[in-house]
């Protein structure tokens, strides 16, 4: 073959890669069609998985394309290429000993550390991932599967649970079938151990591992024997990942695994003289739970504690008291031997990839442009100029003791084996780091009791008047929930003798060993409003009494779907008292210019389109699923390799594969601003509600209520805005500016409808400094009254960008309000509506609460609080 020539297989893989990247550049929005593009990534994975040798071909082409991106400065393509590289390495069966592909990849991605965030952060994570794979081949696959299957080991005890929340009334039956298939137990512990051991030995020994023979011998082992072999193998991999030199780590791991194999009784199938054939070992299906969800709360997630209590029992996921005792002992040792700690703090170990396949936060830089093999093996731990990028890695996952330093392990023989390595690694921490941790413990030890959600402040009240907190936000339309208090074990519900720790809801410093709870929600903008209200309630409850956040860090995933047309009036529970009639379907609310022409059968998906504008890879692989019919997404994908090894292949629909891809590789959240509205009813009662996408007021809300009544809507009749009875409203709004200043306006309008929507439909609205709502006014210019006919309105529409607004009915004129296109959140007889950004619940009873200066007006207090945002996981986060 001539130099530069390619084979047919290479051409096919290159063509599939080009299809994956098509339309992701800056000109992607000019593409008028997008149906089928979401299958390109899945098709590429299917093509490559047919032969183990295809993975190396794809990796070479990804690196070549990445170098072109670096030369041309094509920012939009870096994140998809990095994710493709990560997922491909994760599934690669084995890297030959003479392959320098990972070294070239480290050299390539090292050049992107000077790019802006998030591109430099993504490359930092890739460098850490590559470093771990160089030292312990296949360790990232092992961690991911261990976490998803609930198989913790002593030194790495994290777990990942995936929960699918669907409303059967909202989604098609095909989606429900796929969700139920995912939640069906597919892998027994015996099968999971077998898969992990096959992968570990093949990743280390390559073609010299007789995979079919090893599979037969593992099948003959009992579950207890497999667990012992797996524990030794996994601990050896974790130890190898902490060795400084990659070549030495691989040699030690190979020797250790060979000894484990001989001890287990199958030496003939490991390190055979005659090389055999590599086998593709797919990632097993993650543990999933599927629930029917149509509430404004996440109370149903407490059932996960009941299902996972074996993994959550004290001493399995970690004993806080023992860890604190160890930290105190380490602090004492450092105080008596400060110079030793200062010297040892220069020795840092590389960080490990996160258990849920999210790339762990780490970086590495080289002192020169050319990266030799020797420099690459220690680019995370040994290069001092890694500090230039502002990166310091301090991961307790990298606490594995070096194999040749065993004398230190025997000094603390009374401790658990998994704690020996943590004990040694903590000696390497600097005194300043321990002081910071001690200070954080003192803050966490304070009471987390929270006050009810409060308003951002009255819009038109004088500054010298105190702002009274509104009544507690009410949960609306929550279905009856089982009382889990009698089912959960006592160690979960017993009052703690000291304040309980909880995981931060959103933090870059989360414990990488913490268990993860993935919450995947399906639906339209109506469902996104329910998620926002449930998230707000969850924060308030967890601030008062941590339960879920004591054991899990929460990740929220949003899968948009078109609302099902087969909604029946009897499918929805009865509405709250303010709702006029039983709701069924949520029609799509037309814009003011489309009133009377657009059908109401569907709700919008603006939130998902907003996420797609922020993250093109989310738009391609998640939002694009809406453009395909369910029968295509539910086709089965059969992997022949799994059939050859397991005997019972796991056939997953395309939709299931894409959902698992989204959950495993979407690691960066996009923060969606949550809004609150304080409503005053004609009786004087007040209530505070949460919304995230839209608030409809007046005729549009009343029409939605009539449409939701089902067959009764024909009897009531539906008029458009031209026939609606006008409302005289006083509208006071604050128009924000880039400088942060606000300009207030006060006007009186005669309107039929006033709608507030999140400004998220245009590319120019993505600037985070200009977070705003779009105020849509349907104003009556002139009303024509006739004795023989109905009154007829001449209307005009206008739009205003606002950040706060107050709407008051003149002479206490009542109107209806609908939140997030939700028929269950239609409130009648409202005379006053105040809308403002929502703030996080306050924490009371802090050890030293900050005192407000007497000269500071009460109106300014909300500025000291953080805005409440709903974190939705995406692949790249918000791109600059």
From Swiss-Prot:
Any coiled-coil regions, as ranges: none
Biased composition (Acidic residues): 318-335
Predominant place of localization: nucleus
Heterodimerization: region residues: 25-101
Region Disordered, annotated ranges: 315-339, 389-416, 454-510, 565-601
Amino acid composition bias (Pro residues), ranges on this chain: 571-585
Organ and tissue specificity: Ubiquitously expressed with high expression in fetal brain compared to adult brain. Abundant expression is observed in cerebellum, cerebral cortex, cerebral meninges, and vermis cerebelli.
Pfam families with a match to the protein in the record: PI3K_1B_p101
Positions where Phosphoserine occurs in the chain: 458, 507
Compartment(s): Nucleus; Cytoplasm; Cell membrane
Assigned GO CC terms: centriolar satellite; cytoplasm; cytosol; membrane; nucleus; phosphatidylinositol 3-kinase complex; phosphatidylinositol 3-kinase complex, class IA; phosphatidylinositol 3-kinase complex, class IB
Residue list for modification N-acetylmethionine: 1
Keywords recorded for this protein, A-Z: Acetylation, Cell membrane, Cytoplasm, Disease variant, Membrane, Neurodegeneration, Nucleus, Phosphoprotein
Its membrane topology: Peripheral membrane protein
Region (Interaction with beta-gamma G protein dimers): 653-753
Disease note: Ataxia-oculomotor apraxia 3: An autosomal recessive disease characterized by cerebellar ataxia, oculomotor apraxia, areflexia and peripheral neuropathy.
Functional description taken from the UniProt entry: Regulatory subunit of the PI3K gamma complex. Required for recruitment of the catalytic subunit to the plasma membrane via interaction with beta-gamma G protein dimers. Required for G protein-mediated activation of PIK3CG.
Subunit comment: Heterodimer of a catalytic subunit (PIK3CG/p120) and a regulatory (PIK3R5a/p101) subunit. Interacts with beta-gamma G protein dimers.
Comment field on protein domains: The heterodimerization region allows the binding to the catalytic subunit.
Protein's name in the database: Phosphoinositide 3-kinase regulatory subunit 5
Species of the source: Homo sapiens (Human)
């Amino acid at each position: 073959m001539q130099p530069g020539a390619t084979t047919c297989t290479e051409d096919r893989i290159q063509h599939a890669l080009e299809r994956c990247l098509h339309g992701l550049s800056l000109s992607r929005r000019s593409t008028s069609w997008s149906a089928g593009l979401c299958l390109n990534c899945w098709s590429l994975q299917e093509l490559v998985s047919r032969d183990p040798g295809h993975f190396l071909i794809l990796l070479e082409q990804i690196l070549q394309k990445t170098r072109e991106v670096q030369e041309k400065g094509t920012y939009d393509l870096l994140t998809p290429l990095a994710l493709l590289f990560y997922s491909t390495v994760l599934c690669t069966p084995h890297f030959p000993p003479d392959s320098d592909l990972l070294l070239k990849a480290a050299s390539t991605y090292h050049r992107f550390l000077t790019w802006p965030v998030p591109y430099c952060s993504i490359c930092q994570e890739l460098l850490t991932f590559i470093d771990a794979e160089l030292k312990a081949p296949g360790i990232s696959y092992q961690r991911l599967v261990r976490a998803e299957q609930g198989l913790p080991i002593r030194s790495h005890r994290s777990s990942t649970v995936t929960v699918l929340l669907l409303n059967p009334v909202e989604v098609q039956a095909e989606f429900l079938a796929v969700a139920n298939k995912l939640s069906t137990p597919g892998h027994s512990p015996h099968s999971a151990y077998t898969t992990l051991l096959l992968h570990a030995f093949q990743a280390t020994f390559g073609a010299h591992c007789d995979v079919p023979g090893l599979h037969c011998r593992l099948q003959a082992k009992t579950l207890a024997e497999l667990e012992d072999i797996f524990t030794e193998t996994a601990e050896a991999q974790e130890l190898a990942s902490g060795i400084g030199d990659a070549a030495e780590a691989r040699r030690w791991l190979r020797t250790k695994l060979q000894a484990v194999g001989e001890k287990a009784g199958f030496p003939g199938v490991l390190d055979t003289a005659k090389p055999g054939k590599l086998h593709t070992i797919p990632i097993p299906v993650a543990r999933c739970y599927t629930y029917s969800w149509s509430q404004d709360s996440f109370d149903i997630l407490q059932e996960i504690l009941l299902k996972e209590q074996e993994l959550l029992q004290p001493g399995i996921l970690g004993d806080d008291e023992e860890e604190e005792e160890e930290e105190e002992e380490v602090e004492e040792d450092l105080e008596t031997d400060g110079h030793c700690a200062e010297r040892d703090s220069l020795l840092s170990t590389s960080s490990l990839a996160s258990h849920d396949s999210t790339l762990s936060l780490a970086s590495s830089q080289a002192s020169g442009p050319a990266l030799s093999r020797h420099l690459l093996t220690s680019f995370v731990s040994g290069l001092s100029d890694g500090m230039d990028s502002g990166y310091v890695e301090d991961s307790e996952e990298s606490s594995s003791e070096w194999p040749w330093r065993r004398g230190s392990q025997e000094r603390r023989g009374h401790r658990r084996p998994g704690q020996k390595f943590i004990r040694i690694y903590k000696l390497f921490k600097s005194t300043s780091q321990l002081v910071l941790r001690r200070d954080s413990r003192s803050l966490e030890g304070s009471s987390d009791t929270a006050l009810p959600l409060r308003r951002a402040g009255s819009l038109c009240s004088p500054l010298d008047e105190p702002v009274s907190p509104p009544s507690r936000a009410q949960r609306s339309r929550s279905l009856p929930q089982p009382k889990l208090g009698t089912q959960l074990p006592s160690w979960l519900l017993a009052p703690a003798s000291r304040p309980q720790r909880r995981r931060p809801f959103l933090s870059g410093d989360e414990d990488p060993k913490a268990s993860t709870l993935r919450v995947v929600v399906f639906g339209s903008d109506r469902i996104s409003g329910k998620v926002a209200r449930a998230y707000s309630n969850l924060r308030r409850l967890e601030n008062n009494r941590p339960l879920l956040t004591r054991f899990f860090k929460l990740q929220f995933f949003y899968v948009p779907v078109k609302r099902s047309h087969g909604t029946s009036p009897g499918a929805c529970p009865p509405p709250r008292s303010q709702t006029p009639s039983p709701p069924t379907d949520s029609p799509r609310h037309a814009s003011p210019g489309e009133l009377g022409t657009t059908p109401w059968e569907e709700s919008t998906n603006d939130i998902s389109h907003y996420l797609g504008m922020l993250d093109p890879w989310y738009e391609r692989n998640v939002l694009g699923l809406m453009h395909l019919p369910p029968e295509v997404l539910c086709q089965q994908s059969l992997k022949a390799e799994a059939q050859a090894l397991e005997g019972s292949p796991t056939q997953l629909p395309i939709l299931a594969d894409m959902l698992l891809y989204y959950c495993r590789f979407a690691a960066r959240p996009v923060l969606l601003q949550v809004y609150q509205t304080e409503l005053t009813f004609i009786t004087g009662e007040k209530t505070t509600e949460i919304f995230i996408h839209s608030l409809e007021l007046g005729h549009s809300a009343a029409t939605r209520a009539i449409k939701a009544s089902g067959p009764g809507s024909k009897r009531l009749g539906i008029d458009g805005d031209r026939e609606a009875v006008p409302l005289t409203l006083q509208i006071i709004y604050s128009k924000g500016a880039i400088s942060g200043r606000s300009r207030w306006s006060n006007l009186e309008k005669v309107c039929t409808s006033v709608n507030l929507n999140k400004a998220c439909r245009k590319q120019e609205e993505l600037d985070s400094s200009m977070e705003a709502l779009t105020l849509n006014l349907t104003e009556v210019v002139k009303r024509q009254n006739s004795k023989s006919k109905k009154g007829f309105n001449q209307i005009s529409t206008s739009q205003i960008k606002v950040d706060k607004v107050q709407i008051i009915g003149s002479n206490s004129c009542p109107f209806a309000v609908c939140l997030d296109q939700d028929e269950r959140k239609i409130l009648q007889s409202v005379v006053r509506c105040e809308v403002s950004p929502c703030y996080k619940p306050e924490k009371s009873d802090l050890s030293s609460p900050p005192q407000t200066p007497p000269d500071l007006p009460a109106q300014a207090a909300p500025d000291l609080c953080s805005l409440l945002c709903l974190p939705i996981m995406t692949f790249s986060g918000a791109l600059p």
